[in-house]
Amino acid sequence: TGTMPHQHGVEINSLPLPQNMPTIGSILRNAGYETYYIGKWHVPRCFPQGTDEIPGFFNDPIQNNPLGEFTDKEIVDKVISYLKKPKSKPFFLTVSLQNPHDICHWIMKDKTQFLEKYSPKELDSLPPLPANFAINEEPEFLKIIRQPKDYGQETKYTLKWKEIDWQKYLYAYYRLTEKLDSDIGKI
C-alpha cells in the first residue's frame, strides 16, 4: 500500500486489509500491467488486492504447511514456470518466500525434524557473536518485550540461552538466508 500499519489499520497479522485500500498491484493493473502475487501473505480473508494468483497455487500454502522448507520450493518452481511463458503485456510479479522465517520454528521446536540440517555439525564452525552481544543491564524495552502476550512468544524460548545457543541460532539463520539467496538465484 505504501502506507504505514497505523494508516491502513493492519497492525497485527490477524487483521484484513481494507478492501478499498489502493495497492501497488491495483495501481499497476489500472496502468495496464498483469499483476501477480505468490507466496507468504499474512493478511487474512483477502487476496492481495490488484493481483491475480498464479493458477493452481494460491491456496494459503503457509496455513497448511507453515515451513518455508516445503513451500519455498513450490513457489520457486511456479514462478520459474510462469516467467518462461510468453507475455502479451508488461507484468509486475511479487514473490514472497517464507524463509528465513523458519528460524522461528528452529527456536520453538527445539531444532527438531528437518531443521537439524541447519544446525552445525562441529562447534568450530559457529559464527562469532557480535561485539555488542553482552548487555550489562537489560534495557526496559527488552523487559517489556519478554512479557507474556498473544503474539511473538519466541522470546520465552531464549530466556536461558547461553552464548553457544545464540551462536547455533546465528549459524542456522545464516544457512536459511543462504537458502533464500539460492532460491532467488534460481528465479
Model segments located where?
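Active-site-proximal cap/lid insertion segments
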Residues: K85-K87, L97-I187
